[in-house]
Amino acid sequence: ARGGEVGVFRRDAGRAGGWAREGGFLVQGGVADCAWAPREAGTVLATAGPGGELSFWGPSGADGEWASVAPPLEVAPCGGGSLRCVRFAPASQGLATAVAGEDGCIAVCRADGFRADATWRVEGRFQAMPGSAAVSLAWRPYGGEGVPPMLLVGTTKGAAVWMFDAVLGKWTAAGSVPLTAEACVEDVDWAPAVGRACETVAIAVSNWALILRVAGDPGALNIEKCAEFEHPAAVHQVEWNLSGTTLASTAGDGVARLWKENALGEWGEVAHVIGQ
């Protein structure tokens, strides 16, 4: 997105793996972040505006242009200010999003039904870390009956895991990420727990990509660092593959790196791509 204009691209198998613009749309007031809905909801993109507006978009016809598929939702943060990040929950938890605000407030929004054109509402809010901006979000990638929804929240002063307590009807802190000092967490991601006894998350902070294990009861999580990778420049993004076995990181030096655990449980770089 640039200047409120959002472009949608699709990989073209006939052009040696190149990408071609498929369509786009213009968001009045600009775009702070965007996110794809789960496939079960169809082809839907959510945009978070700096003015506090959450909008939902989809293809409108054969001409490739997109249009709004639901009335915009005003997601005014707890103390006002702009939105920074939006992420959809896994499909097992229904059609829901979490939106992070400049004031550190997280708003959880839900649709009445599993269609993006349904009516959306703000279901709940919580303050992630007082005195800091919330800049990145990652949902626990699975859920359902007996598994409480969880969110990993990165802020300008650190990161923590939050859990929805169905008994209390609100979000509560479930565990904090151990950092040596207050630091801005640029990005976070929660790995799918495929064949693992514990869950794994990753965060980007300063020149480092950190991998942490999450274990314990939902109400008292134990979060421990198990690997750290120093980069020659600030790390901007971290993302797991679909099986949660390989981590990708991008940094300010224009290089994307892949990290993987070997048979001895040791993590290391296995490949890198230099941007052009």
Where are the regions that the model predicts?
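Conserved beta-strand element within WD40/beta-propeller blades
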Residues: 1, 45-49, 97-101, 151-155, ...
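Per-blade loop-tip surfaces of WD-repeat and WD-like beta-propellers in eukaryotic adaptors/scaffolds
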Residues: 8-21, 40-42, 51-73, 91-94, ...
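Surface loop/turn motifs at the tips and blade-to-blade linkers of beta-strand repeat domains
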Residues: 24-26, 74-78, 126-129, 177-180, ...
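Helix-rich alpha-solenoid scaffolding regions
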Residues: 26-30, 44
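Canonical WD40 repeat/beta-propeller blade segments in eukaryotic WD-repeat proteins
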Residues: 29-38, 78-90, 130-143, 182-193, ...
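A beta-strand-loop signature enriched in Asp, Gly, Thr, and Trp
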Residues: 172-176, 183-192, 200-202
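Conserved blade-ending motifs and adjacent loop-strand segments that build the rim/top face
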Residues: 176-187, 221-242, 273-276
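C-terminal, well-structured subdomains that either form a transmembrane helix-short loop-helix hairpin
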Residues: 233-260
